[in-house]
């Protein structure tokens, strides 16, 4: 877990999610505001973290320009991470541009405005239309409407909508509270990801229609609530890899 803190001894730190032990971090005398994590450098293994500077997953400082920390977004088709807004837009409700460390500015949504002053948050970032890229929701400058932007960046990757992941779905809900931090999927999302590790518990189960209450559930035949409940809508072939 990568966190930006307000007090000593750590101004920011990467902690073990299970134990809370610090893997690496740095002292800071002041509140550093916000921090972020994502795949912004395709040449570096794993994810990168940044607050004042950019670091790799082992805590080594990288010679990269530090992106903004307003909100991350999965916008590009190469499974990398982008940010909405940035350092040029911290002085008021400016438009929520989508910036990328290698691709440059990928979207400049003119006529829109961000929220929460210096935090520069969009109304929402979420994968609401399917695909695996996220949509960007921004209000118009005159507050007359909300505009939805979706990526047109071509991709050869195929992945179901991120809302199938329970952790990501919860993250979309908490985006609208307090500091509006981005949600992340429970699996490793990056340009070097192994698709075999994406929600294996969903791939390994047939989907069964339960006629008793008209709902769709997913379980193996051995786990059926009682004999004769439902018929499989789709049965995973033996030995199939999806």
Predicted regions and their residues:
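Extracytoplasmic/lumenal domain signature
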Residues: 1-200
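Serine-esterase "nucleophile elbow" of acetyl-processing enzymes
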Residues: 202-242
């Amino acid at each position: 877990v990568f966190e930006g803190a307000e007090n000593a001894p750590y101004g920011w730190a990467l902690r073990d999610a299970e134990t809370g032990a610090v893997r690496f971090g740095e002292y800071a005398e002041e509140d550093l505001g916000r921090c972020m994590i994502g795949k912004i450098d395709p040449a570096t293994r794993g994810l990168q973290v940044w607050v004042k500077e950019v670091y790799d997953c082992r805590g080594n400082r990288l010679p990269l320009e530090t992106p903004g920390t307003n909100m991350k977004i999965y916008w590009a088709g190469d499974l990398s991470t982008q940010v909405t807004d940035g350092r040029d837009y911290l002085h008021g409700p400016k438009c929520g541009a989508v910036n990328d460390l290698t691709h440059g500015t990928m979207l400049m949504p003119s006529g829109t405005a961000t929220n929460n002053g210096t935090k520069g948050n969009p109304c929402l970032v979420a994968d609401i239309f399917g695909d695996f890229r996220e949509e960007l929701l921004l209000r118009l400058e005159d507050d007359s409407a909300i505009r939805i932007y979706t990526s047109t960046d071509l991709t050869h990757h195929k992945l179901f909508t991120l809302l199938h992941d329970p952790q990501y779905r919860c993250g979309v809900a908490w985006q609208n509270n307090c500091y509006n931090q981005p949600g992340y999927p429970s699996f490793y999302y990056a340009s070097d990801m192994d698709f075999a590790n994406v929600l294996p518990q969903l791939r390994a189960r047939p989907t069964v229609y339960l006629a008793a209450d008209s709902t769709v559930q997913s379980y193996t035949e051995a786990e059926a609530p009682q004999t004769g409940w439902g018929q499989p809508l789709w049965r995973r072939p033996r030995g199939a890899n999806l």
